[in-house]
């Protein structure tokens, strides 16, 4: 695949099976890939997750992270999403931070999240 998001039909079939957003969409609709109705026990459960992004990212639009967080917080059953955190830097670019101070802050958030998840 030359570019993520390529509309090639065969590649889309593969991507759809691995995309957390697409998997969540199927669960929300209650329909499995084989067309059978899903039960609550069949549904995908989200791990604890932290999304970081930048408003000024010129390669991956922050709308992708926003859309996933919205789906997790508003569309998924609460018991399926144990922890969902979101941080968007209004300055940085594709790397998420505009300077070392912002980069340090972003990494501090990341390490604090990992410490929480790992029980440290």
Regions picked out by a protein language model, each given a short descriptive name:
Residues 1-120:
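Active-site-proximal cap/loop segments of hydrolase catalytic domains
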């Amino acid at each position: 695949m030359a570019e993520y998001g390529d509309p090639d039909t065969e590649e889309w079939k593969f991507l759809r099976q691995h995309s957390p957003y697409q998997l969540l969409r199927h669960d929300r609709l209650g329909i499995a890939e084989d067309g059978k109705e899903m039960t609550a026990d069949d549904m995908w459960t989200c791990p604890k997750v932290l999304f970081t992004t930048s408003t000024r990212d010129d390669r991956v639009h922050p709308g992708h992270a926003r859309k996933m967080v919205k789906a997790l917080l508003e569309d998924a059953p609460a018991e399926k999403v144990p922890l969902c955190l979101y941080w968007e830097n209004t300055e940085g670019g594709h790397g998420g931070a505009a300077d070392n101070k912002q980069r340090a802050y972003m990494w501090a958030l990341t390490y604090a999240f990992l410490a929480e998840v790992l029980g440290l």
